[in-house]
């Protein structure tokens, strides 16, 4: 069987396909959000490469990578029609399950993933000294890069919020990304703590 070519030339004029075939501009908020998900996933992949001996953290980060891939796949589905159960932000969060009514053919409930991150954050925070001031990103290469991932994650959150102003975005996805940035921050602290690297703190000043 002949191998297909990687390039198609269909995007040479600045347009690309959504998962359902809809054509959108590569400069759209949709593509900005999906691209930032991919960027975060790649950065986390590089962080994983800096942690060859810590299988527990690597396993968790790879689980996060898979979740991000699933989120990106879900969001590439174009909402075909307005859902009467959605609120003004395009979401409907069940009080009992946290399940989002969105993209009927590709629903996923990320509430357990949020809970998993919250448990990780709480467990990790309990291991670390109390944080009494702001800290400078840095320390070990892995810790410094966890901060890079955190910053990209915050940018992803901003992209998703902007996108949600225009089209349905599951609210639980935004919650997940928000919590993920918190986890990446606490992970950066843990990585320095493991290697006994002191944190560099800065005083909060008014200028």
Please describe what each predicted stretch is.
Residues 1-207:
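Phosphate/pyrophosphate-binding loop motifs in nucleotide- or prenyl diphosphate-using proteins
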């Amino acid at each position: 069987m002949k191998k297909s070519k990687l390039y198609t030339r269909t995007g040479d004029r600045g347009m690309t396909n959504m998962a359902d075939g809809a054509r959108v501009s590569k400069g759209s908020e949709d593509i900005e959000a999906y691209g930032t998900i991919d960027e975060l996933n790649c950065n986390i992949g590089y962080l994983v490469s800096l942690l060859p001996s810590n299988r527990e953290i690597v396993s968790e980060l790879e689980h996060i990578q898979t979740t991000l891939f699933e989120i990106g796949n879900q969001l590439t589905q174009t909402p075909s029609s307005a859902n009467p159960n959605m609120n003004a932000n395009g979401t409907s969060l069940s009080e009992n399950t946290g399940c989002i009514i969105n993209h009927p053919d590709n629903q996923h409930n990320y509430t357990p993933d949020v809970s998993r991150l919250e448990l990780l954050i709480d467990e990790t925070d309990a291991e670390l000294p109390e944080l009494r001031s702001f800290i400078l990103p840095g320390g070990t290469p892995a810790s410094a890069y966890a901060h890079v991932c955190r910053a990209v994650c915050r940018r992803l959150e901003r992209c998703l919020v902007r996108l949600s102003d225009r089209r349905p975005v599951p609210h639980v996805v935004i919650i997940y990304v928000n919590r993920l940035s918190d986890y990446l921050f606490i992970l950066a602290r843990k990585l320095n703590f493991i290697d006994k690297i002191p944190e560099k703190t800065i005083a909060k000043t008014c200028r």
